[in-house]
Structure formats: C-alpha cells, structure tokens
C-alpha cells in the first residue's frame, strides 16, 4: 500500500485553509494529556521549526491549582512551520489522548465600552412604572449613595436598629451565674 504524503486529509486541509485568515503563526494545541510536561511538549514542537513563543497554561486557583489546563499556544517563526505542525500533530496520539491542533483565534473582547459603567439591579422586585428607575445608576453613584446613608446613620444613631429585637437574648444588665451547681451536691450522689 503506497502512501501519498502530498495528499492532506480533508480535516487538516480545512484547518490549514483557516490559517490564511490569521495574522501571525499562532497555534492552539488542545486535548493535551496532563502527564505531558511543558518541557516535552516544547521539545516536540521545536522539531517543526523555530518556536517564537510558547504558552503552557496551568490552573491558577481551585482544586486543580498548579495542574495543566490541557491546552497550550505556540507561535512559530513562519507560516510553513505552523502548517507543518498542524499537518503532523493534529490527531496524533500523545500518551493517552489525541492532540487537537488548530489555528489560534484572537480573543474578542466584549463589553469593553461598558466596563466602567456597570448597571446593577437595586431590587429584585419588579417595577410597575415605565419611567427609568434607580437600577440604571452607575456603580459610582450607588457607592456615593451608600456612603451618604452610612454618614447619616453615624450622625443619628437609632437606639433600636431595624432587625434588633427589644427582647434580645443577650442583655448588658443581666448577670451571668458563675457556678450553676454546688460541689457538695455532686459528691453526695456518688
């Protein structure tokens, strides 16, 4: 059975055609076995050309902190090197998993223009009015309102705060009993 190396599998051909839309030569490598080290993966990638940048990602927090995320990014010097890495590595077994190699896509940043002015709901109760409510206030306006209320509360302390019962379990004027039992009564029962 003769194998033609010039023929690309249909899957790899579609991946390579996506590369013409990409700026740079950055690849995403996914489905990486957790036992593969950063060093071994880098050495494997260097066989396909000069690696300009290599980002092997780890969990930063949570129960998996310090463990690999299972994917990485690599930048090659030329597009031909990146295409060769896709052709050779995509679908290949690496320990117990098949590698997935694709062109990396730029992260689209959404809501950047709204970052400073977040809208937070003040109440969970539905409003029956059609006029704009306080829920469209900016975060800074809400902070100022809370600070003003705290200042007002500090200036006019209320003896009975909301939520505080007049029948409080802990009253300052009540004395606690130090010894609820007498030693003599315990000895006589033995």
UniProtKB/Swiss-Prot annotation:
Keywords: RNA-binding. The keyword RNA-binding applies. Disulfide bonds: none annotated. Pfam families: RRM_1. SMART domains: RRM. Residues 25-106 form the RRM domain. GO terms for molecular function: RNA binding. CDD domains: RRM_RBM18. InterPro entries: Nucleotide-bd_a/b_plait_sf (IPR012677), RBD_domain_sf (IPR035979), RBM18_RRM (IPR039157), RRM_dom (IPR000504). PANTHER family: HETEROGENEOUS NUCLEAR RIBONUCLEOPROTEIN. This is Probable RNA-binding protein 18. It comes from Xenopus laevis.
